[in-house]
Swiss-Prot record:
The gene is petB. Its cofactor is heme b; heme c. It comes from Prochlorothrix hollandica. Heme b 1 binds at H107, H209. This is Cytochrome b6. Keywords: Electron transport, Heme, Iron, Membrane, Metal-binding, Photosynthesis, Thylakoid, Transmembrane, Transmembrane helix, Transport. Binds 2 heme b groups non-covalently with two histidine residues as axial ligands. Binds one heme group covalently by a single cysteine link with no axial amino acid ligand. This heme was named heme ci. GO terms for biological process: photosynthesis; respiratory electron transport chain. Component of the cytochrome b6-f complex, which mediates electron transfer between photosystem II (PSII) and photosystem I (PSI), cyclic electron flow around PSI, and state transitions.
Length: 222
């Protein structure tokens, strides 16, 4: 009843004449869903929902977080103890981060076990693997931002891993850290990656991933 009233309204007709909203809606709602699809095919969508929650709560926290080695921890404590519902926003961000990684792993397993990576969906699989790497990168960069003991030593260990690579190892370590040792330059780089670079990358590859799924449809059963 409500839908019919909206479609008969003058505003809806005005937009529909110019943007063909009804045709777009029909195309989305009429997409064929194979009968073998079950709840495990929702894991990718749940991962997307977790990312949206991450984006919203992360954006909210940027109003209070200070990417400084002297103020980062204090700003997080202020958010947790002084800001209204700040503890809830940060907690949701942490919980949904763990859930996003878990759902992503289960989604990868589901696609692999059902053969969703095979011809003609190789590119969809490749973009999915790239999205998985970006998701893990979000976790690595975000873990250090509170700049507490756990975050500091985590980033020191992670950024020191490439040092074992012959020839280019030390150069890569300095590139990641921004200097010879972990400090303000490291925190600034990780903050920039976490809040600007990685969100753009994941948005681009998500769009590519969804467009390919939309074009090729859901893979059939084994």
């Amino acid at each position: 009843m409500f839908t019919k009233q909206v479609q008969e309204s003058g505003v809806y007709k005005w937009f529909n004449d110019r943007l063909e909203i009804e045709a777009i809606s029909d195309d989305i709602s009429s997409k064929y869903v194979p009968p073998h699809v079950n709840i495990f095919y929702c894991l990718g969508g749940i991962t997307l929902v977790c990312f949206i929650i991450q984006f919203a709560t992360g954006f909210a926290m940027t109003f209070y977080y200070k990417p400084s080695v002297t103020e980062a921890f204090t700003s997080v404590q202020y958010l947790m103890n002084e800001v209204s519902f700040g503890w809830l926003i940060r907690s949701i961000h942490r919980w949904s981060a763990s859930m996003m990684v878990l759902m992503m792993i289960l989604h990868v397993f589901r696609v692999y076990l059902t053969g969703g990576f095979k011809n003609p969906r190789e590119l969809t699989w490749i973009t999915g693997v790239i999205l998985a790497v970006i998701t893990v990168s979000f976790g690595v960069t975000g873990y250090s931002l509170p700049w507490d003991q756990v975050g500091y030593w985590a980033v020191k260990i992670v950024s020191g891993v490439p040092e074992a690579i012959p020839l280019v190892g030390p150069l890569m370590v300095e590139l990641i850290r921004g200097s010879a040792s972990v400090g303000q330059a490291t925190l600034t780089r990780f903050y920039s990656l976490h809040t600007f670079v990685l969100p753009w990358f994941i948005a681009v590859f998500m769009l590519m991933h969804f467009l390919m799924i939309r074009k090729q449809g859901i893979s059939g059963p084994l």
